[in-house]
Amino acid sequence: MTIANDPIVIVSAVRTPMGGFQGELKSLTAPQLGAAAIKAAVERAGIGADAVEEVLFGCVLSAGLGQAPARQAALGAGLDKSTRCTTLNKMCGSGMEATILAHDMLVAGSAEVVVAGGMESMSNSPYLLDRARSGYRMGHGRVLDHMFLDGLEDAYDKGRLMGTFAEDCAEANGFSREAQDAFAIASTTRAQQAIKDGSFKDEIVPLSVMVGKEQVLISNDEQPPKAKLDKIAALKPAFRDGGTVTAANSSSISDGAAALVLMRRSEAQQRGLKPLAVIHGHAAFADTPGLFPVAPVGAIKKLMTKTGWSLDEVELFEVNEAFAVVSLVTMSKLEIPHEKVNVHGGACALGHPIGASGARILVTLLSALRQKGLKRGVAAICIGGGEATAMAVECLY
């Protein structure tokens, strides 16, 4: 069968709660978070653990986790020892890239059932002892922060934080501090409402963690309820004196994981499964590394060309809020109304566990579409290094 007649479908989509930095999920490693998401995704798909042939999982801050973090997560989820596993690092796009590669693997006939997603425990990212391997002959040494070096800093302009490029984007495109704060407040308000009315309930697998000497069940995202909206306007710029980007209108450091089960529609039919959605296409875009905040615009444009969709036909968008300005510039350049974007809030409120976010926004997009009885959605994410990826899905009812 051709891909048009037998498309790739998503059978289940699950995420963990998003934990704050050094917060409720700090006792769990990235593979443990990934294992929880994978186990729940497989169970909700209605397949046996031995049915999964391949696991593709994103993880950016892998130093100190031990060999093959994706394999650890898969076996931790109870998958069969025969399951092949690959850990991916495409920065913030890792979780979505894992899903893209899972899609293409299924199209190629290399597997019949694949789990894709991403995981990150930013709380547990270690410090690195620079030059310790070769030795310190004399003078001062230094300790490097794995999270900053490999997650939050530009690789080309050494030591430059991602937030400074967000500042450049805001200035170049005329987004004021007030506009960015207003977006962050809307994101947080939406997330708080989603928690209050149970909109996240279907997409989250609760986690049991030790808090002090007690075992506690964590079923909600940690950070939105703690946000103090009245304090946002008073925050100092985080990246540049006199700048407009703050801790509130940026994504927060976070822990979490997300997983999706993919297969061909014919495979789902043979197994008696009811898919959540069809993947209609995916696209990637790359430009100058410092222009990563604008890259989702290019990825979405390419995606519309590949799918034959128009932007007006897309009913909901998830555009990862690495910084508020990323979503703002995407909405502005593509003329997308805010009412269609991140309807349950985004990373400014929930957090941005780097390797997981690309999968997390897909999970949240599918959940929001189904709750509202809508069909077509697009998820897009900017990626450090000047890239972005985007994916188009259509819900099945």
Roles of regions detected by a PLM:
Residues 14-16, 27-35, 44, 179-270, ...:
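N-terminal extracellular/periplasmic Venus flytrap/periplasmic-binding protein-like
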Residues 59-114, 156-162, 226-252, 333-360, ...:
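Conserved catalytic cysteine-centered active-site region
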Residues 113-169:
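Flexible glycine-/small-residue-enriched beta->alpha junction loops
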Residues 165-167, 203, 210, 280-349:
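Active-site pocket-lining segment
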